[in-house]
């Protein structure tokens, strides 16, 4: 077999791996949501870049079987994500700091493409990139790029060329939320941060204790995805205030968001949100 034939075989084996395995498994989808600002892009007018797109999971699924993937977000098939999610390779996932960021994606080179842009959020890691920027979309998000009645035709293409642009996220009716992760204890706290308007991502999280420890912000460490943790040498004193900083440097403080009687595996919604 000549080298050219070997290259073709390797390409199609990779295609099968990406399309069939993708990031993870699948989950059901219910309805539609709108949680982005389609009138503007981060930094001004939309700057469209080129990327490859594939899809994974079920044809009408939200992607990850565990409802979250490498970012840790829960129930991405429900509001506000409504299954419009994507795995991103490293330039998009950014080692977890890209989790929650929003992108407009469109395609027009395949006959089944509508050319209409759809917005997806980065909720998982793409381990098999095919280009510098690679969106491994949920089945439903990939299908939304197609003309009416052509979603299955587009999915059968497997790999398509797309254009993308970063846009602000908007989560109508939601405040920034903090999910205290399983395994948290009086000396260890891990929280998942989600639903941030604007950048949508988190670059740094700090915690302030009550009582004697109050008044001093302690940096938390990124554990994985959008989960941040604090390993303490003393019993942490609740309630906890949390300060988050976005990739663009915007800060937001959620005072006493985690109460005195907090418990692991519990979601706590704040009363604060980034302005649109």
From Swiss-Prot:
Glycans are attached at residue 37. Keywords: Cell wall, Cell wall biogenesis/degradation, Disulfide bond, Glycoprotein, Membrane, Secreted, Signal. May cause loosening and extension of plant cell walls by disrupting non-covalent bonding between cellulose microfibrils and matrix glucans. No enzymatic activity has been found. May be required for rapid internodal elongation in deepwater rice during submergence. InterPro entries: Expan_Lol_pI, Expansin/allergen_DPBB_dom, Expansin_CBD, Expansin_CBD_sf, LolPI, RlpA-like_DPBB, RlpA-like_sf. One of its GO terms (biological process) is sexual reproduction. This is Expansin-B8. Residues 187-270 form the Expansin-like CBD domain. Pfam families: DPBB_1, Expansin_C. Its main location: secreted. The keyword Nucleotidyltransferase does not apply. It comes from the Eukaryota. One of its GO terms (cellular component) is extracellular region. Expressed in roots. It is a peripheral membrane protein. Residues 1-25 form the signal peptide. Residues 68-174 form the Expansin-like EG45 domain. The keyword Glycoprotein applies. Belongs to the expansin family. Expansin B subfamily. Disulfide bonds join 71-99, 102-169, 107-113.
């Amino acid at each position: 077999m000549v080298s050219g034939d070997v290259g073709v075989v390797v390409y199609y084996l990779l295609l099968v791996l990406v399309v069939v395995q993708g990031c993870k498994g699948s989950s059901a989808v219910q309805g539609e949501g709108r949680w982005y600002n389609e009138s503007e892009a981060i930094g001004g007018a939309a700057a469209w870049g080129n990327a490859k797109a594939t899809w994974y999971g079920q044809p009408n699924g939200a992607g990850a079987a565990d409802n979250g993937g490498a970012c840790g977000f829960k129930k991405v098939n429900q509001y506000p994500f409504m299954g419009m999610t994507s795995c991103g390779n490293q330039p998009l996932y950014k080692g977890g700091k890209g989790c929650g960021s929003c992108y407009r994606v469109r395609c027009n080179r395949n006959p089944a493409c509508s050319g209409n842009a759809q917005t997806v959020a980065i909720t998982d890691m793409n381990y098999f990139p095919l280009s510098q920027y690679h969106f491994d979309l949920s089945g439903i998000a990939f299908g939304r790029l197609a003309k009416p009645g052509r979603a299955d035709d587009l999915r059968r293409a497997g790999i398509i060329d797309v254009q993308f642009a970063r846009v602000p996220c908007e989560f109508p009716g939601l405040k920034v939320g903090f999910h205290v992760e399983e395994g948290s204890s009086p000396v260890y706290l891990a929280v998942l941060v989600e639903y941030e308007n604007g950048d949508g991502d988190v670059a740094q999280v700090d915690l302030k204790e009550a009582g004697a420890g109050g008044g001093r912000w302690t940096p938390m460490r990124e554990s994985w995805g959008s989960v941040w943790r604090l390993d303490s040498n003393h019993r942490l004193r609740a309630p906890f205030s949390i300060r988050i900083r976005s990739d663009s440097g915007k800060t937001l403080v959620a005072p006493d968001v985690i109460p005195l009687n907090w418990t692991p595996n519990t979601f706590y919604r704040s009363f604060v949100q980034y302005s649109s």
